[in-house]
Each structure stands twice: as C-alpha cells, then as structure tokens.
C-alpha cells in the first residue's frame, strides 16, 4: 500500500501581531511592538502550501484559533460583556490582552506529536496535543488544538487522540518541534527521535543557564508511552544547553530530519556520536540506512543558523529518492549560509535542490517553514479517512485567499488589540472557515449554549 508524508500547515490567524511574547526566541524579542500585516502573513503561508501541493507533495491546512481568548481573560478575573472584558484588560493589564490575542497557533509544529500507525502498538496513528506550558500565550492553545485535530482525523479505526500532558513544568511538551522520525518508507516501521532540553527529575542532566529548556525528557517519555512505541523504535537525545542559550528554543531551529536523513548543526546535541550511533543501529534493524549530514560550525555558526533559520526548513523526499530543502528568504540573505547551501546541493548527496519562500511575517515572530507545518505520515487508507475538507487543492487555495482578503486587516498594532470589533471580525471569519474546512463547531464561541 502506498504511504505519504502529509504536511498540514497552520493558517495564520486574523490577530497576527508582534507581541514579543517568546523569551528565548531571538526574532520574537527583537521585533516586539512592530506593526504586523495579518493579511500578508496568511497569504505568504498559503503561497507555500499551494506551491508544495503543485510540486506533488501532499498538503493540508490546520485552522487558527479564536483570538482574543476572552474565556482565558475571564479566568484571570476580567468580567462583563466580551467587549468589556477586552477593554478592561487593555486598561488594567495590556500584556495579558496581548498574550490572549497571540496568533502563535500558526506554528503547528508545536500543536502535537504524531506517531504513524507503523510504529504504534495498536496500529493506529496517534496524536498528543502539546501542553506548551512554558509560555502562557501558548499554554491556552491545546483544548482547541485537540478539537481541531479531532475534527480533521475523525475516525477511531485509524486515529487515536490523547489530551495534553499535565500542565506543569516537569512535563513541558512542545510537540513535533522536538520530534522527528526516520524510516525507509513512510508506511514501514521507523525510529522516532525525541529531543529534550532538560530532565525534570534527575539533576545529573545539564541545563541551559540563560533561556529555558522547554521540553523535558519526562514529557518525551510520556508521549512515547501514550503512543505505544517500542524501545527499539525510539531514541532520546539531549539538545546542547549552550545552543538553547544562543536562541535555539526548539530542536527544529538546529536540526531537521526526514526519511533516512538527519541534517544537523555540529553543536546541536550532547553526546552526538552516541546519538548518531543509536539512530544508525535502530534504523538498520528496521531495514533503513541512516545518513547524517553535519553542518560544521566553521561553515555556519549557531548565530547564523538562528538568524537565517537554516535548520527550521522542510526536508522533503521525492519519489526518486532525492530531497528538497525548503528554506526562508533569510537563508539567501546570509552570505555564509547561502554559500554552504550551494556546496550542499552540488556534492551529490541526497539534498539536490533548495527552494526559497518569503515568510517574513512569520519569520519576524520567530517561525520559519518547519514551524508552520505538522507532519503526519499516512497510509493510503488513512489519508482517505482524513477530513477531505482540509486537504489543499487549487479550489481550496482560491477559496481561502478570498476568505483572507474579506476578513483580515492589512495592519495591526498593539492599540488595535483593544478594539472589541477585532473579536467580532475574528469570530465571523472563523465561523465561515469551519464551513469551508468542514470542521463543525470547534471554537468556544460556537459551542456556547
């Protein structure tokens, strides 16, 4: 049976703004308080989805969340009508309103961790929504994320959904941004690679000193248990604390893997040789031939990697065995990174083409091509069981472009977040979107009695 990797990209929401909310994320911090363009941001994301679909890659779309999150503000003590809640939050606690308006759910690499059916004990595709408890503005996402994923993958025969892990620091879980999978074919058993920043319960593990390590070993282990993964199909690795302190807040900022290939920076991991040895041996036991492409620090510094988002790229496998690397425009603008990519594609290795996308609106908030997508490996029968309303087609692309142009503002600043009309605009847009994508009532405002 045929099998595919399907990339489900996050659709940028109507409240996309530069709130500077993500400590440890260099771009998010440095672009704080700039004016944003939600319409352009959504269009840039859709353009990438359409281009990859046109190239023959399986592509889907993941809906944004209702923002501002009025219910979250009510839990923090603001009362009155929805408009009054927003106005009172703006007057008394603007940072809380900014957080409640974040469109960060666009970075769906953090939405969940996904294990394909070939790896799991019960032969179903497993999803665990990420609790994202390190940052308040992201910690409020997972209830809606779970409902949206449930509406997309709504077939108990093929799909199993788990709620987020306990929302405490010991089980900090950032989803697929710290997870990748190696395999000889998407429908065959593979090796799942979990990368963590610290251990919550074992002080022998080192930890970063400046920025927080958002993923714990214990969270990764819990997800592997929930998904019914076998020990011979899992490798755990600790991310180098020194690179976390340089702005590598998720592993997908310093490495990317797909198929049998890991593309990584020399400084990405602790005990790199041992990690690569485990990956090589475990993949070999499943009939795969692991290939590691190391980018030396002499060619690309960690600072260059963070500024260009070289590793926050999409590594895509073609049917002929060659690979395409999808990178942001910022890679071409970095002389050392661009020189390295020229060498990479001319060496005769698996990566023989680089494709550039303008994702500036997302990049300025610290999210590149890899942040914007959630990968789901599916067999043909499983793909047929997915809600077909979320699969990207030329028709859906045109419909979504028109939807964006109708509902999204072309400029948004902090002061605009206090406008109650923005909530009305967002709910109107999302109500229409659920009909376009055939999701049903997944948003809180649609579920109120």
UniProtKB/Swiss-Prot annotation:
Alphabetical keyword list: Arginine metabolism, Hydrolase
Organism: Pseudomonas putida (strain GB-1)
PANTHER family (UniProt xref): N-SUCCINYLARGININE DIHYDROLASE (PTHR30420:SF2)
Protein family: Belongs to the succinylarginine dihydrolase family.
EC number assigned by the record: 3.5.3.23
Active site: 174, 250, 371 (nucleophile)
Name of the protein this chain belongs to: N-succinylarginine dihydrolase
Disordered: region residues: 23-43
Binding site for substrate: 19-28, 110, 137-138, 214, 252, 365
Pfam families named among the record's database cross-references: AstB
Subunit note: Homodimer.
Pathway connected to this protein: Amino-acid degradation; L-arginine degradation via AST pathway; L-glutamate and succinate from L-arginine: step 2/5
Catalytic activity: N(2)-succinyl-L-arginine + 2 H2O + 2 H(+) = N(2)-succinyl-L-ornithine + 2 NH4(+) + CO2
HAMAP family: AstB
Disulfide pattern: none
Function according to Swiss-Prot or TrEMBL: Catalyzes the hydrolysis of N(2)-succinylarginine into N(2)-succinylornithine, ammonia and CO(2).
Any GO molecular function: N-succinylarginine dihydrolase activity
InterPro entries documented for this protein: AstB_sf, SuccinylArg_d-Hdrlase_AstB
EC main group: hydrolase
One example of a Gene Ontology biological process annotation: arginine catabolic process to glutamate
Polar residues composition-biased segments: 25-37
């Amino acid at each position: 049976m045929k099998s595919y990797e399907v990339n489900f990209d996050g659709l940028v929401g109507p409240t996309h703004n530069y709130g500077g909310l993500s400590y440890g994320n260099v771009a998010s911090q440095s672009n704080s308080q700039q004016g944003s363009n939600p319409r352009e941001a959504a269009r840039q994301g859709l353009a990438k989805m359409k281009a990859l679909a046109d190239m023959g890659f399986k592509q889907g779309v993941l809906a944004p969340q209702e923002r501002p999150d009025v219910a979250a503000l009510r839990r923090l003590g603001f009362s009155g009508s929805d408009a009054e809640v927003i106005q009172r939050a703006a007057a008394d606690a603007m940072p809380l309103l900014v957080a409640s308006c974040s469109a960060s759910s666009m970075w769906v690499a953090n939405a969940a961790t996904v294990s394909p059916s070939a790896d799991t004990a019960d032969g179903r595709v497993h999803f665990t929504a990420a609790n994202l408890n390190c940052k308040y503005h992201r910690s409020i996402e997972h209830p809606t994320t779970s409902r949206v994923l449930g509406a997309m993958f709504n077939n108990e025969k093929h799909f199993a959904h788990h709620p987020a892990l306990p929302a405490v620091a010991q089980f900090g879980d950032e989803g697929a941004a710290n997870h990748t999978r190696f395999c000889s074919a998407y429908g065959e058993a593979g090796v799942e690679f979990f990368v963590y920043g610290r251990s919550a319960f074992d002080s022998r593990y080192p930890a970063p000193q400046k920025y927080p390590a958002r993923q714990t070993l214990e969270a990764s282990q819990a997800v592997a248990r929930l998904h019914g993964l076998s020990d011979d199909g899992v490798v755990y690795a600790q991310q180098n604390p020194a690179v976390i302190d340089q702005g590598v807040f998720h592993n997908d900022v310093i490495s990317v893997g797909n198929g049998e290939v890991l593309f990584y920076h020399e400084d990405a991991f602790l005990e790199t040789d041992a990690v690569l040895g485990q990956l090589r041996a475990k993949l070999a036991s499943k009939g795969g031939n692991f290939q590691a492409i190391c980018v030396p620090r002499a060619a690309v510094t960690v600072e260059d990697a963070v500024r260009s988002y070289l590793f926050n790229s999409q590594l895509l496998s073609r049917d002929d065995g060659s690979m395409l690397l999808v990178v942001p425009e910022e890679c071409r603008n970095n002389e050392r990174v661009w020189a390295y990519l020229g060498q990479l594609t001319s060496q005769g290795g698996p990566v023989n083409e680089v494709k550039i996308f303008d994702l500036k609106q997302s990049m300025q908030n610290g999210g590149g091509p890899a942040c914007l997508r959630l990968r789901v490996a599916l067999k043909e029968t499983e793909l047929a069981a997915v809600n077909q309303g979320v699969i990207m087609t030329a028709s859906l692309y045109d419909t979504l472009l028109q939807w964006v142009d109708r509902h999204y503002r072309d400029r948004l600043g902090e002061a605009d977040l206090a406008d109650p009309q923005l909530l009305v605009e967002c709910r109107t847009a999302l109500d229409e979107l659920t009909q376009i994508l055939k999701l049903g009532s997944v948003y809180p405002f649609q579920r109120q009695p």
